[in-house]
Regions:
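Hydrophobic anchor at the start of a short beta-strand
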Residues: 6, 38, 77
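Short, glycine-rich nucleotide/cofactor-binding loops
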Residues: 6-22, 50-55
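Histidine-anchored nucleotide/phosphate-binding helix
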Residues: 20-36, 40
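Short glycine-enriched, charge-decorated loop/helix-capping segments at active-site entrances
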Residues: 53-58, 94-96
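A glycine-rich helix N-cap at a beta->alpha junction
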Residues: 56-85
C-alpha cells in the first residue's frame, strides 16, 4: 500500500434505519478519489452490505451497488468467510467482485494500514 492508506471495517447491518454503512461507503469514495489507497472489510452484520438480495426494493441507496462501484475504482473489498458461514449465507450470494477474507487477512490489512476506521 502507499504511504497514505485507509482501512474501513464495516460491522453494522445495512438498511437498519441508520446511514452508518452509507457513510462508510461515502468515506471510501472520498478517500479513493483523493488518491488514498483504500480497503473495505465486511464483518459481522456488515457482510450483508455485499449481498445484492439484501437491498429492500424501495431503498434510496443500493449499498451493494455502491460497493461494487468502489471495487471498479480500485478499492479492495473482502468479507469475513466465518461470518458468512455463521449467517448461513452462501458465497454465491455475494456480489462477484468481492473477495473472501479471513481474520488473518484482516489482521494483515490492519498492520499495513495507516488509518483504520470502524462503522
Amino acid at each position: 500500500m502507499s504511504a497514505s492508506s485507509l482501512l474501513i471495517i464495516i460491522s453494522s447491518p445495512p438498511y437498519a434505519g441508520t446511514d452508518r454503512v452509507w457513510n462508510a461507503l461515502r468515506l471510501a469514495e472520498t478517500a479513493v478519489s483523493s488518491g488514498t489507497a483504500t480497503r473495505v472489510f465486511l464483518i459481522n452484520d456488515g457482510v450483508d452490505t455485499g449481498r445484492p438480495a439484501a437491498a429492500p426494493p424501495d431503498v434510496e441507496y443500493n449499498l451493494c451497488a455502491i460497493l461494487t462501484e468502489l471495487v471498479d475504482k480500485g478499492v479492495s473489498v473482502r468479507y469475513c468467510k466465518t461470518c458468512i458461514d455463521r449467517c448461513g449465507v452462501g458465497a454465491g450470494e455475494m456480489a462477484p467482485p468481492l473477495e473472501v477474507g479471513s481474520m488473518k487477512g484482516l489482521h494483515q490489512w490492519i498492520i499495513e494500514s495507516d488509518r483504520v476506521v470502524t462503522f
